[in-house]
């Protein structure tokens, strides 16, 4: 029956190309093999039953001559029958394996008689096929056509008619032996399918090493199981398949540049784009999410792998420790910034204390604050910032102790100017300190020059003895001397410098005040000087007030060369001339004419009018009081209008420096108020005198 099936299979073999890449195609033929086995079993079973029926009708002699197998089989014990069945199963297993693998043999067996092997050669051929399957899992690239052709040549002379006799002896088995035979053949077919499925096609160029290791393990396990049932046979020697006798390890068609590592490599077709980057000397970087999906490091040194995080690449340069950290690069905080941070931390800690007190009804202690990590951080930062603020203030105070040549502009930043300019300034300061004279020597030179100028211009040393022009010249000379001193030593900062230069600065200040405040200097002997005093003379009831007694005494003491005159009008004329002289001195010295200066002669006349009030009667005083009140109301209305307009325009109240446009009105208003107070005092005095009389 096997000879009838083989022509069909040979026709299929002619249509299929013989290539090692089609080794996996024989799996589809397993179903045909199984149907062939079932057909063989049915045929054998029917033949055995028919033969037994014929034997039962024939005689004992004819049955012994024609069929010795069944009679001997009935007489042998059961254990021997089991061994016989096992050998027969091995023969059938070899036949099935031969039928399955026959399509890979191009021109081995042509006839029907060549399809049947004896049991020993079938077992040997089965072991060779298993070894061949194991060798297929290794990455050796050999041509299977030449190898199978050589294998078929070695087995051409091993065929004999003994296999035919064994096949005929199997046909005489009992029906009871046919059932275990069918079950054993099914198990063998399942084993053949497993071996077929264990064999992977070689269409892949390269596999992972772990997969190849597992496949080799499975193949080795399968060989061990087969060797447990099949007796040990010599393995297939593949050296005879090839003319060359020197065998070496397989060489892959593509080798990476760093072939030292034994890690698995990807296909060369996968990294063409990365090759372009590598040609431009740009190292591929690893992705930041590379290490989140495992601890595998087999692709770290492979430049063909897509980008990965740079922290594990062998060609990635580490950050130098000399560059410093981010904290070192932070600039020092200014005192203002430190104060703001301290205030912010205080607010946070205060909020925590209030919330803690609301929840637990008591103030948090230091341990309560330390238990909270956030508050503990705030406390530590607060202490650190306070320490930095204290150190910065101490540093600034130490820097301020050293005298500076000039005040630095606040509009310019601290880093204004290049480093070379700063170095030049420092060098210049050192040279100036070496050449600069002492403060005492500079002061002596200044005083000597001032004395020489006084002698040249014939000015007295005492300011009281100077005239208008002499005071102005003294002011200019002192101003030039002080500017010369400040150009050398700067403004006096230390206590010793201030004590040394104090007399010269005081003299300049006094001269300047005399020139700038000549209009406000009280005139000796003038009734208005007494009126401008902070407080009036106390008026005692029952006594006559003497308003001009002290004034006449001052006149007598100041005028040594001139004789005193009892007439008060002469004194007023002298006072008015002196006042006008001081006004002229102020105009010549400062060059500024105040609108109040034109009204000063009228003040002299007003003072002369006020002097007559003491001899006036009560009706005259009352009339004059009424006039002063009306005049006060008019001036006050003008001043109120001016202040309201100024507030609407500028949005603020009038300050002292804003009163310049209305300076005359303000001054007149002040004098009118003083007159009103004097008139009220005189009227009250006259009333008291009249009542007493």
Curated annotation (Swiss-Prot):
- List compositional bias (Basic and acidic residues) regions by residue number: 184-197
Disordered: region residues: 56-89, 136-233, 302-331, 396-424
Per UniProt, the keywords (alphabetical) are: Phosphoprotein
InterPro entries (alphabetical): FAM13 (IPR039102)
User: Sites of the modification Phosphothreonine?
Assistant: 402
Q: Where is the composition biased (Low complexity)?
A: 159-171
Membrane-spanning residues: none
PANTHER family tied to this protein: FAM13, PROTEIN FAM13A
- What does the annotation say about its assembly with partners? Interacts with ANXA2.
Role of this protein: (Microbial infection) Plays a role in the clearance of Pseudomonas aeruginosa by macrophages. In complex with ANXA2, promotes activation of Rho GTPases following P.aeruginosa infection.
According to UniProt, the name of this protein is: Protein FAM13A
Q: What is the lineage of its organism?
A: Eukaryota, Metazoa, Chordata, Craniata, Vertebrata
Gene for this chain: Fam13a
């Amino acid at each position: 029956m096997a000879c009838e099936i083989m022509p069909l299979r040979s026709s299929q073999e002619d249509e299929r190309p013989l290539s090692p890449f089609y080794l996996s195609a024989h799996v589809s033929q397993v179903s045909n093999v199984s149907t062939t086995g079932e057909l063989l079993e049915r045929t054998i079973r029917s033949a055995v039953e028919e033969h037994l029926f014929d034997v039962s009708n024939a005689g004992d002699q004819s049955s012994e001559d024609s069929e010795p197998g069944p009679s001997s089989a009935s007489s042998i014990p059961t254990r021997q029958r089991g061994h016989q069945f096992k050998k027969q199963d091995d023969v059938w297993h070899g036949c099935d394996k031969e039928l399955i693998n026959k399509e890979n043999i191009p021109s081995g067996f042509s006839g029907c008689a060549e399809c049947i092997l004896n049991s020993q050669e079938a077992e040997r051929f089965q072991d060779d096929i298993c070894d061949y399957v194991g060798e297929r899992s290794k990455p050796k690239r050999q041509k299977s056509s030449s190898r199978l052709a050589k294998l078929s040549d070695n087995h051409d002379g091993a065929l004999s008619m003994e296999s035919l006799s064994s096949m005929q002896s199997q046909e005489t088995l009992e029906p009871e032996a046919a059932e275990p035979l069918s079950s054993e053949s099914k198990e063998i077919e399942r084993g053949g399918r497993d071996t077929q499925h264990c064999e992977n096609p070689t269409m892949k160029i390269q596999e992972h090493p772990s997969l190849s290791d597992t496949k080799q393990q499975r193949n080795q396990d399968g060989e061990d199981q087969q060797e447990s049932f099949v007796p040990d046979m010599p393995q297939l020697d593949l050296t005879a398949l090839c003319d060359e006798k020197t065998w070496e390890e397989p060489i892959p068609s593509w080798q990476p540049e760093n072939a030292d590592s034994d890690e698995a490599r990807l296909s060369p077709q996968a990294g063409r784009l990365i090759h372009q980057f590598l040609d431009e000397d740009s190292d591929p970087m690893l992705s930041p999410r590379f290490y989140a999906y495992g601890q595998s490091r087999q692709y770290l040194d492979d430049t063909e792998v897509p980008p990965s995080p740079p922290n594990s690449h062998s060609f990635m340069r580490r950050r130098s420790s000399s560059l410093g950290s981010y904290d070192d690069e932070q600039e020092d905080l200014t005192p203002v910034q430190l104060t703001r941070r301290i205030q912010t931390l205080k607010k946070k800690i205060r909020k925590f204390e209030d919330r803690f007190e609301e929840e637990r009804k008591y103030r948090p202690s230091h341990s309560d604050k330390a238990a909270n990590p956030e508050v503990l951080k705030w406390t530590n930062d607060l202490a650190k910032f306070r320490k930095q603020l204290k150190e910065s203030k101490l540093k600034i105070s130490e820097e301020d102790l050293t005298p500076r040549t000039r005040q630095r502009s606040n509009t310019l930043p601290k880093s204004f100017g290049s480093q070379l300019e700063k170095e030049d300034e420092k060098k210049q300061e050192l040279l100036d300190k070496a050449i600069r004279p002492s403060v005492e020597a500079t002061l002596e030179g200044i005083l000597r020059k001032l004395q020489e100028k006084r002698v040249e211009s014939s000015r007295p040393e005492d300011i009281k003895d100077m005239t208008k022009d002499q005071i102005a010249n003294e002011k200019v000379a002192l101003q030039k001397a002080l500017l010369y001193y400040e150009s050398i030593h700067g403004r006096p900062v230390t206590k010793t410098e201030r004590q040394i230069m104090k007399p010269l600065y005081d003299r300049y200040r006094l001269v300047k005040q005399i020139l700038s405040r000549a209009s406000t200097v009280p005139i000796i002997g003038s009734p208005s000087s007494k009126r401008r005093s902070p407080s009036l003379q106390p008026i005692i009831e029952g006594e006559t007030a003497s308003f001009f007694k002290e004034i006449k005494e001052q006149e007598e003491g100041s005028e040594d060369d001139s004789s005193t005159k009892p007439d008060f009008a002469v004194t007023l004329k002298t006072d008015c001339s002196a006042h006008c002289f001081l006004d002229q001195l102020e105009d010549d010295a400062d060059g500024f004419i105040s609108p109040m200066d034109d009204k000063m002669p009228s003040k002299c006349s007003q003072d002369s009018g006020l002097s007559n009030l003491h001899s006036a009667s009560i009706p005259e005083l009352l009339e004059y009081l009424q006039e002063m009140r009306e005049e006060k109301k008019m001036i006050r209305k003008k001043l109120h209008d001016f202040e309201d307009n100024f507030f609407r325009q500028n949005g603020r109240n009038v300050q002292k420096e804003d009163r310049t446009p209305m300076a005359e009105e303000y001054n007149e208003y002040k004098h009118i108020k003083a007159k009103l107070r004097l008139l009220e005092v005189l009227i009250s005095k006259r009333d008291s005198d009249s009542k007493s009389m």
